[in-house]
Amino acid sequence: GSPVFIAFRSSTKKSVQYDDVPEYKDRLNLSENYTLSISNARISDEKRFVCMLVTEDDVFEAPTVVKVFKQPSKPEIVSKAPFLETEQLQKLGDCISRDSYPEGNITWYRNGKVLQPLEGAVVIIFKKQMDPVTQLYTMTSSLEYKTTKADIQTPFTCSITYYGPSGQKTVHSEQAVFDIYYPTEQVTIQVLPPKNAIKEGDNITLKCLGNGNPPPEEFFFYLPGQPEGIRSSNTYTLPNVRRNATGNYKCSLIDKKSLIASTAITVHYLDLSLNPXGELTKQIGDSLPVSCTISAIRNATVVWMKDNIKLRSSPSFSSLQYQDAGNYVCETALQEVEGLKKRESLTLIVEVKPQIKMTKKTDPSGLSKTIICHVEGFPKPAIQWTITGSGSVINQTEESPYINGRYYSKIIISPEENVTLTCAAENQLERTVNSLNVSAISIPEHDEADEISDENREKVNDQAKLIVGIVVGLLLAALVAGVVYWLYMKKSKTASKHVNKDLGNMEENKKLEENNHKTEA
């Protein structure tokens, strides 16, 4: 079109005149040094301007072209695919940058490297659109991409390259990382709990895994001896397994049965048989074979206990004694399998017929004699004291605790004449009777050593003390032998006497001649 005058300044009048041009209204400023400034620049300001100098002689012109630039917005990737599937050409997203002048160029990057179009693998479609009002451009670039597993966690970006007053510039978008879908190429199977710790009664869980993304959610599970698979989620549980569950287990994909995994499972078991078991009653002297039989998938340790004390070897009874009685436990375990142990018990009761031993001892004061009836038997025998001849029962007795099948009953008497005491011990097996002649208190006699109690059985006298005692005893025996014989002969002629007040009145003893035929203990 025709040139339009927009501003004039006279060198003499020092005044500025602006023509009435609507698009430049209030936007022009012509300075004293003839510099023209245009404020609030617009795209329409991009045109050719001419500075004219008019003199009396001539007209001079100096043209210039004004370029207008607008920096675009930072590019961003929109309409992003939720995931990328391998071997599929699909739209990855759009890179968009707005409000640019002039238009810019968009470039796509994979892991920082420029993506170039490649048939069937990389397709880039570029579009630009100008706003009719602002005359600014919006650039859009769509990327179609065939991904591979190598793109897992790989960043994609795009950039806008544009021109400004100082030259070419580039602005990059934020990174975008996509979830890569790929098919399963391998199947694995897991066993919970770990395979080396499975025992009878456990619940086994088979877990099948595929290495695809997303992982498969369903599988076929194959049990030993069953060709048909069981469709299930990625886990399958076998409750309360028995030893016949030992075997090979497999799993495969639903849609590709050739992708299969297998594992061997061993169900550990442990059987224990104790014969005899429970509670058993035997008599002393009996023989008793005992066997503890173990059946296991591998070697197992066997431990015998008696009354919570570990035995060195298996018990064997060719002739039962009372001390063999007790609670026996046979226990076995597989050390490598936690919790796999078995135990059986035998409570052995050894019955013993009552056995009696009687002892007597004179008090050092010489005023009384202690008579003790030592009894061994099981069940615990009842003890009864009587005076031979009169049949009187003695009730004033003192008993020791019943320990290990033994105890004793003790009486203290002061007989005025010779007497015979009877101790009877009775349990459900038998009644046993023993008698002991006791001289009158005035007649010295040989005392018998007390029975050593079980709890003190291991405490024996020192050998030196024993020898000294024997020597002293022999000397004393030689000294009193004559005296004892004289007193005894004298007493044998004496009429019948009465037993000490502690025993009460007793009936008259048999004739002295009959007593003389009894053997004194």
Swiss-Prot record:
UniProt-annotated stretches for the region Disordered: 500-521
Occurrences of domain Ig-like V-type (ranges): 63-172
Cell compartment(s), UniProt: Cell membrane; Cell projection, Axon; Cell projection, Dendrite
PTM note: Glycosylated.
Protein name: CD166 antigen
Residues carrying covalently attached carbohydrate according to the record: 29, 33, 105, 203, 244, 299, 395, 418, 437
Topology in the lipid bilayer: Single-pass type I membrane protein
Keyword Cell inner membrane among record annotations: no
Gene Ontology cellular-component terms listed: axon; dendrite; immunological synapse; plasma membrane
Alphabetical list of InterPro entries matching this protein: CD80_C2-set, Ig-like_dom, Ig-like_dom_sf, Ig-like_fold, Ig_sub, Ig_sub2, Surface_Rcpt/Adhesion_Mol
Gene name of the record: ALCAM
Extracellular side: 1-465
Domain Ig-like C2-type: from-to ranges: 183-266, 271-347, 354-439
Main location: membrane
Compositionally biased intervals (Basic and acidic residues): 507-521
Topological domains, Cytoplasmic: 488-521
One BP term from GO: adaptive immune response
Role of this protein: Cell adhesion molecule that mediates both heterotypic cell-cell contacts via its interaction with CD6, as well as homotypic cell-cell contacts. Promotes T-cell activation and proliferation via its interactions with CD6. Contributes to the formation and maturation of the immunological synapse via its interactions with CD6. Mediates homotypic interactions with cells that express ALCAM. Mediates attachment of dendritic cells onto endothelial cells via homotypic interaction. Inhibits endothelial cell migration and promotes endothelial tube formation via homotypic interactions.
Domain text: The CD6 binding site is located in the N-terminal Ig-like domain.
Pfam family, one: Ig_3
Listed transmembrane segments: 466-487
